[in-house]
């Protein structure tokens, strides 16, 4: 794992987070939490063999949440200067003073704070030049278009890199953070046959570029998936078993996750309201939460509570 390439070190972000908490406490807050994040990356796209876009992004932000008993206030800024942080903490406190009390407001209990923060191997920067990214994107698109003569057009291929750093602290004494990366290659093409036109895509994404599928493999699969759609037709309405491919099956699970999320339950905006203890999915389905998978795209050593 390479050293992070950020404007601030993780230790500096953690000190800034602690400073936010001190400012909130001085303003009268009984509890507070702060998040500070940095991120930068690039995205290159090509279409029909020509470079279409070269984009760079760099962002940063501070988010402050304060509690005056059971009154809550929140404010954020993209300016990391000491004065901006002071103003943001003050704004959050001013908001909290005028909000209604909510019996469920507050930090998670202190004994629920993470004690050990494991290294999940989430940071693998990809020192990819723009020219190298363009070459990979062109290779990906070319591979897709060579799959079949019926592939007549392209929506493009892209190569992206991203690095981020995050720190979180709260008034229970917790202060932690980590760096992450995410790399990706994608392609989408269009195929025609008679009066039928179909499009499909494929992509690969990973924490480390070494774990990505090759650009040629991504393009080839995008082309094969597109051609496979040609000749498709409606079927009659029927009650039959349905087999979903992996990329669609995960979407079905996301509906369940959304339905049982705390926010939706609190707002009573879920179809699973009052379903605690009830069977809501097929008995052969088991869902496990594994937040500590090494290099996992959704892995995290701790959450924001």
Where is each model-derived feature located?
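Active-site bordering "gate/hinge" segments
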Residues: 1-304
């Amino acid at each position: 794992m390479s050293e992070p390439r950020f404007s601030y070190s993780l230790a500096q972000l953690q000190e800034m987070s602690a400073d936010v908490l001190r400012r909130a406490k001085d303003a009268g807050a009984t509890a507070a939490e702060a998040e500070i994040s940095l991120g930068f990356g690039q995205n290159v796209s090509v279409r029909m063999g020509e470079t279409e876009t070269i984009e760079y992004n760099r962002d940063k932000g501070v988010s402050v949440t304060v509690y005056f008993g059971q009154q809550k206030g929140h404010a954020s800024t993209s300016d990391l200067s000491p004065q901006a942080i002071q103003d943001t903490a003050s704004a959050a406190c001013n908001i909290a003073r005028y909000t209604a009390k909510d019996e469920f407001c507050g930090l998670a209990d202190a004994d629920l704070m993470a004690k050990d923060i494991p290294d999940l191997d989430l940071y693998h920067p990809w020192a990819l030049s723009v020219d190298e990214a363009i070459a990979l994107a062109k290779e990906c698109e070319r591979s897709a278009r060579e799959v079949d003569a019926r592939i007549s057009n392209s929506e493009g291929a892209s190569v992206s890199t991203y690095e981020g750093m995050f720190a979180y602290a709260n008034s229970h004494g917790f202060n932690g953070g980590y760096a992450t990366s995410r790399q990706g290659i994608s392609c989408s093409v269009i195929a025609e046959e008679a009066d039928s036109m179909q499009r499909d895509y494929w992509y690969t994404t990973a924490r480390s570029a070494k774990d990505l599928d090759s650009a040629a493999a991504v393009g080839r699969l995008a082309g094969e998936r597109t051609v496979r759609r040609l000749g498709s037709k409606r079927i009659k309405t029927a009650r039959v078993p349905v087999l979903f491919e992996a990329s669609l099956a995960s979407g079905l699970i996301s509906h369940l996750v959304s339905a049982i999320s705390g926010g939706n339950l609190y707002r009573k905006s879920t179809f699973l309201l009052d379903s605690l203890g009830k069977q809501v999915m097929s008995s052969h389905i088991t869902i496990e939460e594994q937040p500590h998978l090494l290099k996992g795209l959704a892995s995290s050593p701790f959450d924001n509570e």
